[in-house]
Structures are given as C-alpha cells and as structure tokens.
C-alpha cells in the first residue's frame, strides 16, 4: 500500500555538514563543541557546594562570545541490570548476589554539554524557518576565521573553569564519539534512536499534526518556554523532605524533580542563548516607551511597562547579563497507557518545582530537531524567554546516580535510589587519590541496625579477593560464614577459635622467628607486661616506665646472646627476679621509684605454677600464617578483666607477625566489641603502634562498636582509634538522635556528613529488603549505600538464633553440607507454596 503521507529521507533534511577536529559544523556554518559531563553523585552535595557549582557555571558562561548557545542535555534511560555470572571464579554467594539483581530495573543517567557559535540572524529564526521546513540547504563558507578562533579559545576557558571547580568534569568528545565508528554508535546516531547503547537501530521518524513518533516510541514534550510558567523564585538548590529531619537537611538541585527523581525514559534539555546584551537592553527600553505611550488604552500595557522597567533596573543595578532561556522534558514510551502516566508524572514533577506544566504538542518536531547534537542554532526563538544567567542556571540539574569505582578491588553495595548494584572501592583507590592516608575503618551502629550484616558482607568479599581476614568477635556473628568457608575449603580455611578453659588461646611474646627484635616488637612486649602489671586507671610513673623498658631490653639482649635461655615469660620473670634485681641494686634505684617486689608479685600468676601460667609460655606458635579466614570468639571471657585484654593482645600479636611475613598480600583485622579490652590509657601507645604497623604492611584494622557511650566516654578511642581510621562507617543513628552532636564532634563529621548519616533508612523502598549504611572517606568523600543481599547471603550472615538453628539443623540432615542447606532454605522462602 502506498504511503499517502508526505515522506522524505533523513539525509535530505540532515542539518549537519561535517565534523572536523572534534567540532560539529552545521550546514548553516554554526560550530558546536561537545562534552561529556560528570556531575556529583546524588545526596552528596550541600547548599554551599550547590552555590559553588552555580558560581562556576556562571563564570564559565560569561566567557562565551555573543550569539553563543549553551545546551546541556541530560539523558535518563531505563535499563535492566545484567548480572556478571559468567566468571568461573565466582563464589556461591557472589553468584547468588548477582542472580538476586538479575533484570533489576534502574535509571541510567548520561549528561552532555554542547557549546555552539551561531550568528545574529540565526539566533532570531522562528520555528517556521527550521531546517525541517526548508526545501534544501546550501553549505555556507565560514569566512571569518578570527571568530572561530576566538570562540574555540572561549570554549577552552569554559572547560578549564568547570574542571577547576572540583565538582564537575567536562571531557571533550572526539570525532569518533560524535559520528560513531563501525563498532559503536556516536552521539548523533544515539539521539535519533533515543538510546545510549553502543549498538543502536535507526528508526523511522513520524511527524504528525498532534504527535511525533520515533519507531514505536511516542514522544511527550513539556516545555518551560515562558516566564509566566516559571515560579516566583528560583534557587540553586532545594530541601529534599523525604531524607531531611528537623536536625538535618538533605539538599538537591532546584531542577532535580525532572532529573534523577523522574523515573521514566526522558531527556531534559536546558538551553541558554547568549545574545548581544546591549542590543537586548535597547529593545527593552524601546518596548517600555511603547508600553508607556499605550498605557492609557490598557492597564495591561501599564503593568507590562513596570515589569520591563524592573528587569532593566535589575540589570543595571546588579550588573546582570540579559539572556534567553528554554528548558524541555522529552519523555517517550511505546505504550499509550504508560504515556498517560508519564505525562502526569512529568506534570507533577514540574509542579514540585512550582512551574506551570505545559504539555506542548505543536512544537515537538522543531524542538526535537533543535536538540540534535550540533543543531542547537536551529532552535525556534519564540520558544525562549528572557531572564538573567544566574536564574537560567538554576534550571540546570546538578547531580547524577551513584557510580561504581574504576578499581579492580572493592565491595558490592547497592544504589539507595535505584537499587542497582555498585562496585565501590573504599580502600585502594581513595588511598591512591590521596583521599585517605590509611585503610583503617571505624564502624558504629546500634544493635539491630544491620551492622553485623554489613561486616559479614564486607569481609566475605575481602576474603574472596584473596585477603587474609582475622576477626575478633564476642557474639558468634561470623559463625555461619566461617563454617561455610571451612566446609568449602575442607578445613584449610575458615578456622573458628572459641576460648575455653580446656583449650585457651596462648602464645609466647618473646618468640621471634628470625631472632630480630625491632623497636615495634619491643614496644609491644612492654605494653603487654604493663597491661599485666597496672590496672586501667593506674598510670605508670616515668621511673617505672624506664625500669620496665630497661628490663625488657636487657632480657632481649640476653636471649639473643645466650641460646641456652629459652625465650618465654618464665625466663623473663626469672631474669627480673635475679639478674635485673642485682642490676637495680648496683644502680641504687630506690624502691619508691621502682618496686621490683610489687612487680614480681603482680606478675606471679603468669609464671609457672601460677593461675595463668599457660598464657605467655606457649611452646608452640599459633600456626595461622597461611589460614586466610580466622575467627576468634571471645564471648566466654568478655567480662574477665585479666584474660580478655591479654587474649586480645595475643591475637593482635598473631596478626602483626602474620603481617610482617606475608608481603604484598592484603591483611585485615576486625575487632568487634573486644576493642574495649584494649581501650585503656596504658594501651594507647600500643594501639597507635598497631595502626602504624598495619598501614606499613598493606593491612587494615577495623574496629566495630554499637555503644555510643563507650566511644564518647573514652578519650583513648578518639586519640588512638578514630584519629587513625580515615574511613568511618555509620549505620542507622536515629536511636541516638539527641546525642548526635557529641558523636559528630567525636568523629569530626562535617554538617554535610551529619545530614547524610541522619538520612539513613528514612525513605527505604517498600518493595526491597535492605538497611542503609553511610561510608565516609577522609572527610572529603561520603555517601549512603544500601546493604541489600540475596536470600542465600542472608541465611549465611543472619544472627537470628531461630534462623541459625533452622539452617544448621537442615545442614545436619544433609550430611553437613552447609551450602546445600543454604540453597534449599533460600529456595523454600522464595517459593513457599512448593
């Protein structure tokens, strides 16, 4: 059947002439430079930072010559998550995680910026002179080379100003990225197919009287093209109520409702037209005079005259530049019913900005045509309104979705808005960029906030990326994960130590494999003995410190020279009792300066025959060097004032010796509530030494706590742990809302970070099961992520007693196959009717 509608080819009407040196040249000799724009992540920008971004745009726009066009084009495309399950080395839990998010829909954001130099004549053209309506085009010669050179210099300045702002990155597109190659589509091709994928299909474009179609997609256009449609007041940013509280403020850009918060396929076009400012003002002066002379005939003329005069007064008094502006939201769908919903959604989002929603059907083709990269000068002048640069820039969207880290190492978290999995590196990349100076982490989350879930999720992924993980726990939080690793590796890994009187954890502090005692090792021995000798609240005198230091040094000298002396606590005790006592007498050290009998008496329980003689005289070292996942469970002794701190130090010593021997391998020690055992004044130097050593040997020390009171009341925590942890991780703090000022001061959080922390779990998606977590790096980079996991991971990490019992009972029935038990249990919960 013959097509009765008038048809033509795209080639016939195509408005672009060529692309040279990364510049798009139109058939009317307009020159356009294209950029890819990287915006800050959602919910990570404060009001002051939005002001700074606005100021940078303002400075940049002002360097462009007259008759330039700034066109920012934001693409928001619905996509589905494609899981990466083809890798052979994926673990059972990683594969479960990927499957859980299979086909998860999310909104992908891509942002472009086009800077166009046109002419006075072109900037005044209306829609009836669009290249769409003209029969043929004749390429013009660009006669004035100086104009082009000056424009390109201004573009270079524009790029520098924006990139120097520290918030936005502009990357200039090359010719291949504009026109495409045989393998990948360019931005022009992508525009005509309403897609951002590298492989696109060009579709027929249908321009009807009341609708426009591209392939099967019907376009729905809303425009902001009249000052009357605008709100009475615009700003750089606005308060996002869903994530704000009476004590915190979550900010988004003024135009965010039509950006990432509008969850449908759409393009948000923002145009600023820079005309001749002086000529604009002359026109307005003339218009004001005309209105004045006609004011007797109509009150409207009198009102219009006063509006024009107010605009002129503002221009002269504030030194503002007159420009034209236009914004439009181009949404589409191949389903007419869905399109009705989209139309309502766009209208609602515009109303949130206090703009008057205007559904435009007449100008859709010409506005679509003007949005072609490089064809900005074809914009119909009647669709723009006069304003100032500052106000026009408030209509720019200034944020994007969360991004994955470009790093091979990292952990999988989830975007709190879209639910898309993200790969984030909170250790290596921030270190490389200088955002942090150490990899240590401090985690704070009250009971029930999802803390152990997050730590399980994190250490599991560290382990799978070949890190050595050592955990000190007091609540069986890691039993499921450890047991699973143990069974998977047939006992080679996943070692679970529980402190019992029959099988206590013991070691030898004086044992060094290579026989070399460096300063750090000597310091750790001194700290250990000091902990045994003095109570937490009993600080040693300077004389006592010197005497202890000399005792340790001279004993070490003895054992390195005399191989007949077995290095252990027993021989150290005997040495102090005999040789060192004589040494003190020779030096006339007074008893009040160092009471050696008191020292020996206090340490006697650790000497042979004493109550704790097994603790420091082990004849065998804990052989944990090649075990990659170890858990020490100290729940049985967490209230024991002697055993708890000593055992914790022993474990830390084991970790340090592991660190020294394993070169170039990531090591991680995570201390749960056991940190309280070492948070005494006498331990301060030891903790500082531990943190210093950890950094030196490619390690990470992670301290986890749930009690705010503990950290507020302990100066040692602040000085030794928090100050040496550049990564802070906080979970839901609403429980401590009234105490949050002291937490903020203690952790050194900025107001921006405070707002982010207090937004945790305020607007969780009802259809997804997850808890949110805030991760702050070095006080400069921070965001809130979701810890969402598959059911398989859930049953591995769960700390619920009933769920654990159900899992282990099923595992026993299946002959101890924990992985199969997890699979079966997860499947039964997913499909309960089977």
Regions found by a protein language model. Name each.
Residues 1-399:
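Extended, folded cores of ATP/NTP-driven motor/assembly subunits in large transport
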Residues 427-460, 469-478, 495-503, 635-755, ...:
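Conserved P-loop NTPase motor cores
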Residues 40, 47, 51-63, 263, ...:
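P-loop NTPase motor domains
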Residues 23-29, 102-107, 317-322, 414-416, ...:
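Short glycine/proline-enriched loop/turn "hinge" motifs that connect secondary-structure elements
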Residues 31, 109-111, 468, 628, ...:
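The start of beta-strands in P-loop NTPase/AAA+ ATPase cores
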Residues 132-160, 353, 445-450, 796-821:
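Short, cationic low-complexity segments
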Residues 85-90, 127-132, 374-377, 484-489, ...:
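Short secondary-structure boundary/capping segments
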Residues 100, 514-567, 715-834:
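P-loop NTPase motor core of the ASCE superfamily
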